[in-house]
Amino acid sequence: PNENDGEELVRTLDFVEARPLITSLGIVPLGFTRHQDTFTESFNEPARAQAVIDAVRPYQLRNRKATGRTRYQLADEFYLMARTEPPCAEEYDGYPQYYDGIGMVRSFLDEAADLLADEEALGPIRAAAQRLEMAGERVLLVSGCASAHVVCDFVSALPVGGRCEVVAVENDYFGGNVNVTGLLCACDVLAQLPQDLSHTVVWLPDIM
């Protein structure tokens, strides 16, 4: 914020637009922890995140029209913070920056939609929900705060009869604006899960 956004971001986008050999540009919001005092804000307000999306969009559209590729890729955090739908999978150009947090949400949404439309795949989920009900058990699914609403929407669409609940864990260890699932720490998960976990199955992210 106030460094490489606004007019400065536009200059960066213009610089890349004039250099076609740059095949993919990642635009990522500043992340900061509580263990410093230089930075105190980023793009966590919806309006500020949306402003970046709006600034980059014309460049994406022009490049797709000219070359069939997007090139200018916004980190998932911008769409999550603006509470807006990310672009379709095609616009991620094969997800070259997936592990930089660019396109993970779109990939998840598409996989979730495929699962929810597949009656055969939903069968085992219904069966598992019935077993949980018979045993008086529930599932707690751990998520970071940034993507918790996306995961909640998915879980609410599953035929699990209210047996699955999403727990959005605040990142107190790093603090600041760190809120992605991949940077969760065990100390925060343990501190924020219910003390009584009897008859409870806890599902942890595979990366944290």
Where in the sequence are the language-model features?
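Radical SAM enzyme core and accessory elements
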Residues: 83-208
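Flexible loop/turn segments at secondary-structure boundaries
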Residues: 2-4, 32-36, 80-82, 148-150, ...
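Conserved C-terminal portion of the radical SAM core fold
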Residues: 1-38, 47-77
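Active-site-facing alpha/beta catalytic cores
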Residues: 67-93
